[in-house]
């Protein structure tokens, strides 16, 4: 459960184990930035395990692109941020301790333009930079650090929908809704997040009116019948006419910019629209409902993605080629052309398309991931391993990237490294016992090099430092008879 995970994440520590600074802000006295980061990572591992995170590299890259623009104008450089998308039709967004910011697909689809999306992200970023979680805890002072950590583990209001197959994920929802209401950011914190966020939007080049604009959209969502379910965003971020008016007034201090969405805003929306259908045929039918010649480039892109998912590669390729010819700057168009060429077994053309794109956009995460997947299908595992490893060494990886590089290493015949990457994948998704078990399997390989042995054993020792007594016992129970003391604990 979430509670058990956080007990582990806080390293078996009670309040006595956490060193409180002699001086500093009241928030630091209750929850240091390192505590926040540790708690946030533990919650993120739980979310990853729930299977609710959208694993589309193009969508993930886009949300981080918008978030990073905002962060650059509000962060002092001491706080890292990670933005991610949750597959959930409910309209919601949330900030976790440690700078992890989640946005539901339902909220992304509810925004009418990029400025509205930027407004939501700016508001959540401000909650993190202003330390609102720690400050809310300081205001109560009644709970120990340990209880607070457990409470914070449940901050995810609606991380996954209530009808999820994953029982654990369902527990996250139940705990999350209760906890976000329990912490219940004060009205002053909400106004402060609006103020800081609007400033960051203006400085980052977004139209600051986008925040109030989205608040107005949300306020119209409020059902008159109280028995109807409010959107999650309204329950966790109450919107009043006064708050909308204040946001509008603050935005007037910045020059009004005509709203012009980036191409990537439309591309992310089109991909999520395709994914929102239960069947590939449903998505195709939606995008074919308008005459092709009447569609704009984003609608045509969505149509091509729907064709691609339905296996109509020739139809998809024709559209991707047309779009790429018109705009060479859009990475998603290069990916679409390359993928459909490979699917049509035009292998030389597909590889050439990806190579050209990689030279234009070096170390672009979605581009390298899609190229790596294409190379694996062609049986070029060594090359896939090489480009994925270069990306991982230069850009902080997602769990999906690590899982893909494990596939590449395995296909290339490097079993030891494949097991190492699988271990890292399990660690990133919160499974410490599984992480060690893959390293132990690697240590048992007869062809293991000495430098790998030293590296893997050091990694095991490092992981064990973060394991609870129960996890150590679980690890011991899972060991084969005769396992070494290092391996069995």
Language model features with spans:
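Catalytic Zn2+-binding segment of zinc metalloproteases
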Residues: 115, 125-142, 160
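Membrane-active amphipathic alpha-helices enriched in small hydrophobic residues
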Residues: 145-161, 169-180
């Amino acid at each position: 459960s979430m509670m058990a995970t956080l007990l582990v994440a806080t390293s078996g520590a009670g309040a006595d184990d956490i060193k409180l600074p002699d001086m500093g802000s009241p928030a630091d006295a209750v929850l240091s930035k390192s505590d926040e980061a540790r708690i946030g990572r533990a919650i993120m591992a739980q979310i990853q395990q729930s299977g609710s995170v959208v694993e589309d590299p193009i969508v993930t890259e886009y949300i981080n692109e918008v978030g990073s623009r905002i962060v650059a104008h509000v962060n002092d450089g001491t706080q890292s941020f990670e933005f991610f998308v949750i597959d959930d039709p409910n309209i919601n967004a949330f900030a976790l301790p440690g700078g992890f910011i989640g946005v539901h697909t339902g909220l992304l689809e509810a925004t009418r333009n990029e400025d509205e999306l930027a407004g939501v992200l700016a508001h959540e970023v401000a909650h993190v930079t202003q330390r609102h979680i720690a400050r809310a805890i300081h205001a109560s002072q009644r709970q120990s650090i340990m209880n607070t950590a457990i409470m914070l583990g449940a901050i995810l209001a609606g991380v996954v929908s209530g009808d999820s197959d994953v029982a654990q994920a369902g527990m996250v929802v139940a705990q999350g809704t209760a906890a976000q209401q329990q912490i219940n950011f004060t009205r002053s914190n909400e106004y402060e997040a609006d103020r800081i966020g609007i400033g960051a939007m203006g400085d980052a080049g977004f139209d600051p009116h986008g925040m109030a604009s989205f608040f107005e959209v949300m306020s119209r969502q409020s059902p008159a019948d109280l028995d109807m379910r409010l959107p999650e965003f309204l329950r966790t971020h109450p919107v009043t006419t006064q708050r909308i008016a204040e946001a509008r007034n603050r935005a007037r201090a910045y020059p009004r910019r005509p709203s012009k969405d980036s191409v990537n805003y439309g591309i992310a929306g089109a991909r999520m629209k395709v994914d929102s259908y239960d069947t590939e045929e449903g998505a195709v039918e939606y995008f074919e409902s308008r005459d092709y010649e009447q569609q704009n480039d984003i609608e045509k892109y969505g149509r091509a993605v729907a064709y691609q998912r339905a296996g109509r590669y020739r139809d998809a390729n024709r559209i991707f080629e047309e779009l790429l010819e018109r705009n060479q700057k859009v990475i998603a168009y290069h990916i679409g052309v390359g993928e459909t060429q490979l699917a049509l077994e035009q292998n030389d053309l597909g590889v050439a398309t990806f190579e050209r794109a990689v030279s234009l956009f070096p170390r672009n995460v979605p581009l390298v991931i899609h190229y790596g997947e294409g190379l694996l299908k062609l049986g070029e595992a060594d090359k896939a391993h090489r480009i994925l490893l270069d990306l991982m060494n230069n850009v902080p990886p997602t769990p999906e990237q690590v899982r893909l590089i494990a596939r590449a290493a395995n296909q290339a015949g490097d079993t030891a490294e494949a097991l190492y990457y699988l271990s890292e994948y399990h660690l990133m998704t919160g499974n410490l016992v599984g992480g060690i078990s893959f390293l132990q399997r690697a240590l048992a390989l007869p062809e293991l090099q000495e430098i790998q042995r030293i590296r893997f054993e050091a990694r095991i020792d490092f992981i064990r430092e973060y394991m609870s007594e129960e996890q150590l016992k679980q690890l011991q129970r899972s060991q084969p008879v005769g396992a070494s003391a290092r391996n069995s604990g």
